[in-house]
Amino acid sequence: MWINKYACEFSIDENLVAATIMTESGGDVKAVSTKGARGVMQITPATAKRLCKKLQRPFSVAMLLQPQHNIFLGCYYLHNLLNTFDGCAVLALAAYNCGPNRVQSWLEKTPHLTTWEILETHASLETKHFVWSVLYRYGNRTR
């Protein structure tokens, strides 16, 4: 329900959102990572606080465990990342995992490389695995 609603609101493929959720948390609304990311879309409190400030919405760490709020923020964040990286899902997903500033620095260091070469050259094993896992699940959902 929330996936469809917010994917539509932010013009994102709902299958990409669902694949991100399954990769991040397996759909566990109470998931908390070792790095403190929370909820189905595994958003860190720092990222959520920044997004809420930008949206002029109230913020609390507890709201990250509420699917409606978590999916709203996750879709908003993914939408912004897709816009930042010109609709490139690979770079947007990498940024979702390791941060947009890091991905931007990869692009600045090696502008001559393809998207896949940039990912292979610069991304950590965790980020590579995340991107591949989301894309694999996305592919399975869209067949």
Explain the meaning of each model-derived region:
Residues 1-143:
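Catalytic glycan-binding domains that act on GlcNAc-containing polysaccharides
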